[in-house]
From Swiss-Prot:
Belongs to the P-Pant transferase superfamily. Gsp/Sfp/HetI/AcpT family. One of its GO terms (molecular function) is magnesium ion binding. Pfam families: AASDHPPT_N, ACPS. Its EC number is 2.7.8.7. This is 4'-phosphopantetheinyl transferase Sfp. The gene is sfp. It comes from Bacillus subtilis (strain 168). GO terms for cellular component: cytosol. Optimum pH is 6.0. Displays less than 20% of Vmax at both pH 5.0 and pH 7.0.
Amino acid sequence: MKIYGIYMDRPLSQEENERFMSFISPEKREKCRRFYHKEDAHRTLLGDVLVRSVISRQYQLDKSDIRFSTQEYGKPCIPDLPDAHFNISHSGRWVICAFDSQPIGIDIEKTKPISLEIAKRFFSKTEYSDLLAKDKDEQTDYFYHLWSMKESFIKQEGKGLSLPLDSFSVRLHQDGQVSIELPDSHSPCYIKTYEVDPGYKMAVCAAHPDFPEDITMVSYEELL
């Protein structure tokens, strides 16, 4: 398993944008052009090119030759490389991607003030109770820990919104370990959280517990 991250410390230059756009599919180029906010376009573009960059090095392929598709519930995949599993997430200034030989999910969230009503509506009873038990000044952080962990699990499953958020429970313990409460019939999975930046929460979900200790940072220049 490998996890890569791009920190968008500056906007893409026109030259970088044009070069990256040349790597991606016509459909993705059109999607990027339709974004109202340039930052949204850049996040989407960088996520696509990051995957292409990693896959091209691993399999000796040209970036522009990699063909993406989607699975039944919309999870991106590479049909020609069925063992190359990946997942992308972006929020704020971060674009991150996880790679593994088995299905994997990743999520990053920029924290902001929350309403506990959202937690009551979407979280399991156990998770909501855990959240309420936190001190007031810890509740926002724990909310985003829960949200990113749950999103990473849903993305690892690859079933999208067909899997209700309250159908399973996650808990982040004081020692940093994560426990998951799943139906007995469900195959084992594991979650690890990462502290990449103050004001962000990130989690990865995989079919095995062999997580890297850190993420590998990638610069714009390394993608060219």
